């Protein structure tokens, strides 16, 4: 009797989730703000790996602007990680043959 086997589906979902976590841990996203004045890199688990700040921004002495640029770059990086996760998740779920993915 073929058909729906919940245990097999759950095992496959767990395997896909583990694969996705590994893939995202190896993914590195770069995002910028202020026309490249601030650049951040973060991995697919949203861990901040590096921040690069153009020395000219620091020389300006405008701390509030620098804070805003760092915040914007980190938020953009986070948004890009979310997009990468969604894209990878959609691809994996589609491979499982589930409707709607």
From Swiss-Prot:
Q: Which residues form the signal peptide?
A: none
* Protein keywords: Cytoplasm, DNA-binding
| Pfam families recorded | YbaB_DNA_bd
> GO molecular function of the protein, one example?
DNA binding
Output the Gene Ontology cellular-component terms.
bacterial nucleoid; cytosol
Primary localisation category: cytoplasm
UniProt xrefs under Gene3D superfamilies: Nucleoid-associated protein YbaB-like domain (3.30.1310.10)
Q: Does the keyword Magnesium apply?
A: no
Query: Cellular location of this protein?
Result: Cytoplasm, Nucleoid
Q: Specify the superkingdom.
A: Bacteria
Question: Which family is it part of?
Answer: Belongs to the YbaB/EbfC family.
The family database entries (HAMAP family) matched by this protein are listed as: DNA_YbaB_EbfC (MF_00274)
> What does the subunit comment say?
Homodimer.
Q: What does this protein do?
A: Binds to DNA and alters its conformation. May be involved in regulation of gene expression, nucleoid organization and DNA protection.
Give the protein's recorded name: Nucleoid-associated protein Acid345_1974
Q: From which source organism is this entry?
A: Koribacter versatilis (strain Ellin345)
From the broadest rank down, the organism's phylogenetic lineage runs: Bacteria, Pseudomonadati, Acidobacteriota, Terriglobia, Terriglobales
């Amino acid at each position: 009797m073929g058909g729906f086997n919940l245990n097999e589906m759950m095992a496959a979902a767990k395997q896909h989730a583990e694969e996705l976590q590994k893939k995202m841990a190896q993914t590195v996203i770069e995002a910028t703000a202020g026309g490249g004045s601030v650049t951040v890199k973060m991995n697919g688990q949203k861990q901040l790996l590096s921040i690069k700040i153009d020395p000219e921004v620091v020389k300006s002495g405008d701390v509030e602007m620098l804070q805003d640029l760092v915040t914007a770059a980190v938020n953009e990086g986070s948004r890009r990680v979310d997009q990468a996760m969604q894209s990878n998740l959609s691809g994996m779920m589609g491979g499982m043959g589930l409707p709607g993915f």
